Structures are given as structure tokens and as C-alpha cells.
Amino acid sequence: AAVGTSNPLMTLAILFINGLCLGAGILVSTAYGAGDTQRVERQVSTTAIAGTVFSLVFSALCVLLATPLLRLMQVPEEILPIAVQYLRIVFAGLIFTFFYNFLAATMRALGDSKSALYFLMISSVLNIGGDLFFVEVLGWGSEGCALSTVLSEALCCVLCVVYIQFKVPVLQLGRRWFVFDGSLLRSTVQYGWTSAMQQATVQLGKIAVQAIVNTLGINAMAAFTAASRVDDFTYMPQQNIAHAMTTLMAQNHGAGKKERVRQGFFCGLRIELIYGFCLMAVCLLFARPIISLFVDDPAVIDLGVKFLRCASLFYLMPGVTNGIQGGFRGLGDLKITLNSSMLNMGFRVAAAAVLVLVLKVDLQIMPVSYGIGWLSMLVYELPLLIRYMKEDKL
């Protein structure tokens, strides 16, 4: 329970850093599509230097604020010390999180999405193996889980650097890694910060919902944590499809190929819808065995199954919203993605608060708040998408 209730804060920090890297990656994609190799090099080195400084400061702040942040989430006092220790170890390793996400985002921006995927798979395998070793063999508990997360990302950073040195000539910068171009810093910060805030807004909404769920008791917390882990895992492909759309569209936007931009958008949107439908079917049919992978208490499993089945009814909606956001990011309009995410989370949290704190509904009805949030997102995004198409921007 301590690890599970800490995950939203850990994910918030990781997604914030990932957002910075994603925003900078859009600039790399655009420059690469335009054939401006020198700008690509300066953009990469400037992002690396600025990101390193930011990550170290951000890491220190997160370590210092771990306890008050967990208290703000209404984490029970009996598990607070364990949760604090877990978070501090993870936060101390955020520099590795930055470099891993930065290098992976840069490779994707250059069109090498396969290598980024392979390194993600390696990181996941190392993390699982580390969990088994530190927790099951050494008996280190939550500290072992945290250490496994940090070490897996550190090892992946090393593997990324080795791979780049042998396989990615564009990124073999040598001393040029230390070139800092102040003229690029403003756009890097603008894109990176907007993207980071968009990612953070989504997670802040989840944390607020988690705090509301925490008022329902330990069983509800455990069931929600299990179902949320499934949610997070299933949303990853949707988000990665959108990221692939962003890279493809940004490269072609930089090269001035409007038709390719349009084709990339609608192809990605179709893939999102197909995946969303398949995901909905799987979670409806196999909710019980899926939830049983994470918890073994029958009462918690029953709650988690009901929650997941209700949530799965809305899975087509994030497929559409993720696809549209990927398109706007590829065109360089990150403000729309930030505004739509803020609307989504605002309506989701408000709906969750009304359902639980006012109407006193059970946990299994909570996903209705997700649907309300995604609907608000679509209502905001669709008119803007239609306008872009009418103005021949897409």
C-alpha cells in the first residue's frame, strides 16, 4: 500500500521530466525534417545542459518535500515513513530519469523509434528483475523497489550512450555536447515547459482523485491502486502512438510536406481507435484475472474488477483525445494540448469529488468522472481541429 500510494507522486515527477524532453524533441524533429543538422546539434546540447541543471534542482526539491506532499495526499500515518523512504530514493535518481527520457526522445525525434522502444523494454525487464532480487532475495521491501527503479534507468542511460556512440552519427557530438546556445534556450524552455505542464496536469488530476479515493478506506485504496496500474499500463501505447504521430508530423512540418502531415495524423488516429476498441474488449472480458495479478484479497479484487470494467467503457475517448493532442503537438501548438489537459483534469476531479464526497457513491462508479473529463476535452479540441482543417493547417 505504501508503494502504491506513493506511485502517483513518483509518476508526476517522471512525467514532468518526460514532458520537458518531449517538448524539446519536437524542436529536434522540426530541425531534422528541415535538414538543419547544425541546429539539431545545438538543440540537443542546449537541452542536455539545461535539463541536467533543472533535474538536479528538481530532484533536491522533491527529496525535501516528500513528507508534506504525501501528507497532502492524506496518506495514512501508519504507512507514511515507508512511503517517504521509497519516494526519496526514487527522487534522488531523477537525473537518470531525465537522461534516459532525453536520449530516448531525441532518438525518436530523429526517426529511430525502434531503439527507444527496445531500451524501454530493457528498462522494464531490469526493473522487474531488480524488484525480484532486492525484495524477494534480499528482503529490502519498498526501499528495494525504489532502488530497482533507479538502477534500471541508470543502466539504460549507459546503454543509450553506448548505442549512440556506435550507431547514431548525428548525436556523436564529442566536445559539442558542451555547446550552450542561449538563442535556443527560450524556445526550448517554452516547448519543454508547456509539454511538461501538460503531462504534470494529467498526473496532478490523478493525485487529486487518489486523495479523494483515500477517504473510502484501505480496501478502496488497494483496489484503486491495482486498477490504476492497469490503467497506466494500458494508456502507455495510446500515449506512445500519439508521440509517434508528433514526431512524424513535426518532421514533415519542418520539411514543408503538408500532405504527409495530414496523412500521418489520420493514420495515427485510426490506430488509436483500433487500439482503444481492443483494449475495451480485453478489460471487459478479462478484468478479474488482470486485477488478480496485482492483489490477492477477494474483497479488493471484486472492487477492482468493478472499477476496471466501468473504466473500460470509456477507453475509446482517450484514444481520440491522445491522437488529437499528438497532432497539435506535431504542428507546434502545445498550448491547445495544455488547455485541453487542464480541462480534462479539472472536470474529472470535480466530478470525482461530487460523486464520492457529495453523492457518496461506491468506488466502482468513480470511472464516470473519467468519462466526464474526456468529454470536456473532446468538446474543447474538436472545434479547434475543424478550424485547423478549414484553414489548411492540417
Set out the residue ranges of the language-model regions:
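Hydrophobic transmembrane alpha-helices of multi-pass small-molecule transporters
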Residues: 12-15, 127-131, 156-161, 233-236, ...
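Small-residue hotspots at the loop-to-helix junctions and early N-terminal turns
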Residues: 1-8, 83, 87, 146, ...
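Short runs within selected transmembrane alpha-helices of multi-pass transporters and secretion channels
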Residues: 21, 25, 89-108, 116-124, ...
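Transmembrane helical elements of multi-pass membrane transporters/channels
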Residues: 89, 100, 123, 152-156, ...
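Helix-terminus/linker motif at the lipid-water interface of multi-pass membrane proteins
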Residues: 1, 70-77, 133-140, 200-233, ...
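Short alpha-helical transmembrane segments in multi-pass integral membrane proteins
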Residues: 28-93, 137-193, 249-314, 356-394
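Residue-level hotspots within pore-lining transmembrane alpha-helices
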Residues: 13-17, 57, 61, 91, ...
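Small-residue-rich hydrophobic transmembrane alpha-helices
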Residues: 2-60, 97-116, 223-287, 318-340
